Amino acid sequence: MITFNEFLRKVDETFASHQGKNKWRYGQTIMNVLWQTWPQKYKEIQGSDFDCFYDNSTVRLTLAKLEKEWYI
């Protein structure tokens, strides 16, 4: 598994690569990369106050939760 910092790097790289015609929101990118990296945590967060897929205003809360609970 990857570290939290590696996760953030992957989020940033993925976000940058999806800024063409079909732009992704940052929260959407976090959740997509989380699904690939830690599906169990994605399912736990999905639909909660920490789900930033559709709401970028929760990105900071989501990242703080993930950093606190990261398993490596």
Regions found by a protein language model. Name each.
Residues 1-72:
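C-terminal alpha-helical interaction appendages
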